[in-house]
Regions:
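Residue-level detector of flexible, active-site-proximal loop/helix-junction positions
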Residues: 34, 142-145, 210
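Conserved SAM-binding loop
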Residues: 1-88, 204-208
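S-adenosyl-L-methionine-dependent methyltransferase catalytic module, highlighting the catalytic core
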Residues: 58-63, 73-204
Length: 212
């Protein structure tokens, strides 16, 4: 569990929290489209469920291509084209033939999730190739059942938002007995196979192209 060499974030508060936890050797407050490092500086990069929150991806991918060495790996994960369609409340309205309410809910959930992109691999391949990357491999994960746990966790977790605002902690009593029901509800989703044919997220392995 060695700390990553550099972490980037435009939001200072979570960046300082990550810094305090020792997640990064160096935490840098910056936009991903303005990385303050020279060309071909890094040998690899990772993005864990971040790119879907960035409205303009092209400048970010171009900047990432600039600071990565030729042949460097770029690994990331994002929600895919199945994400919105698998939301349980949206499907509930669809089954009642209230499609307009289902669409309204999907827009609402996408908004509170701060998603700008829930795209398929072909869309990502096009973006990546345009920025000088090649797609090495990808697979889907996180089943619709797991998404339902995540979806409802947003609502049942609202009291934790209050404790976070009041005391800076998501979990006030982090003990096994106090988290018994949380564990019971989430364990099946947590232990599911890592590759899911109908998964609503996609994991990508890419690398920066080596120019001939």
């Amino acid at each position: 569990n060695r700390a990553l060499e550099v972490g980037l974030d435009p939001w200072e508060k979570p960046l300082r929290e990550a810094e305090a936890r020792g997640v990064y050797q160096q935490a840098v407050l910056t936009k991903a489209s303005e990385i303050p490092y020279p060309d071909a500086y890094f040998a690899s990069a990772v993005s864990n469920s971040v790119l879907e929150h960035i409205p303009a991806l092209e400048p970010v991918l171009a900047e990432l291509g600039r600071v990565l060495r030729p042949g460097a790996a770029f690994v990331f994960c994002v929600p895919n084209q199945r994400f919105l369609g698998a939301l349980s409340i949206g499907r509930f309205f669809d089954n009642l033939r209230l499609r307009f309410l289902g669409d309204l809910y999907r827009r609402f959930f996408n908004r509170i999730s701060r998603h700008h992109h829930c795209d398929d691999p072909s869309t990502w391949r096009q973006r990546l190739e345009g920025a000088g990357f090649e797609l090495v491999d990808c697979w889907d994960y996180f089943s619709p059942r797991a998404l339902r746990v995540l979806e409802w966790g947003h609502y049942f977790g609202l009291p934790s938002l209050l404790t976070r605002l009041l005391w800076g902690r998501w979990i006030v009593a982090p003990w096994k007995w106090s988290l018994f029901f949380t564990r019971l509800i989430t364990l099946k989703a947590y232990n599911e196979a890592s590759i899911q044919a109908e998964g609503v997220y996609t994991f990508y392995i890419t690398r920066k192209k080596i120019e001939n």
